Amino acid sequence: MASLSRPSLPSCLCSFLLLLLQVSSSYAGQFRVIGPRHPIRALVGDEVELPCRISPGKNATGMEVGWYRPPFSRVVHLYRNGKDQDGEQAPEYRGRTELLKDAIGEGKVTLRIRNVRFSDEGGFTCFFRDHSYQEEAAMELKVEDPFYWVSPGVLVLLAVLPVLLLQIAVGLVFLCLQYRLRGKLRAEIENLHRTFDPHFLRVPCWKITLFVIVPVLGPLVALIICYNWLHRRLAGQFLEELRNPF
């Protein structure tokens, strides 16, 4: 009966060390990508920053870093081979993005988007790729109207109230000056023994009311027209972006 050959201890040890080296090398490049947990808010026309980092932190200068928008994977910004790949951007983001790489040596980058539009609202995905290993993180951008915090009624009240107070003050000063002027004129008339019609020095109440109210109505109407024009412009911009996304 032939005896079975047994592997020697050194060969088993070498095989184990080789397997351990392969496993450790396969896990050496792994990391996690971390983005903002809460939605990022921005106003139309402003700029916004979308931060992203890897954990544990490591130098990402030689990695491929980028942002894209699901579900069609439109490239928002791409960094590869140490350079920004502007030619691969979606047309609507060309010239509007900038990758802040001050802390890329620690695995931290930030995407800055200028001139925020209504069409920018929604999901963004940040990814880091190291050779064949890639991880990504999702984030959300909320785009808001500059006047989202105030209703039209409050806006009109805030604009009209100072004007109304000013007109009331002017009206009171006018009445006070009129009273003093009437007193001086009456004294002069008595001294000169001249007679005047008593209605000559009186100013009708409707003239005073008109003097106070008309300057208030003018700014109020102008403010309402300006507010409606601004909202129509923002709505038109939003519809134009929907018709021509590219």
UniProtKB/Swiss-Prot annotation:
Signal peptide range in chain numbering: 1-28
Lipid bilayer topology: Multi-pass membrane protein
Record localization: Membrane
Transmembrane intervals: 154-174, 210-230
Extracellular side: 29-153, 231-246
Keywords: Cell adhesion, Disulfide bond, Glycoprotein, Immunoglobulin domain, Membrane, Signal, Transmembrane, Transmembrane helix
Protein name: Myelin-oligodendrocyte glycoprotein
Gene name of this polypeptide: MOG
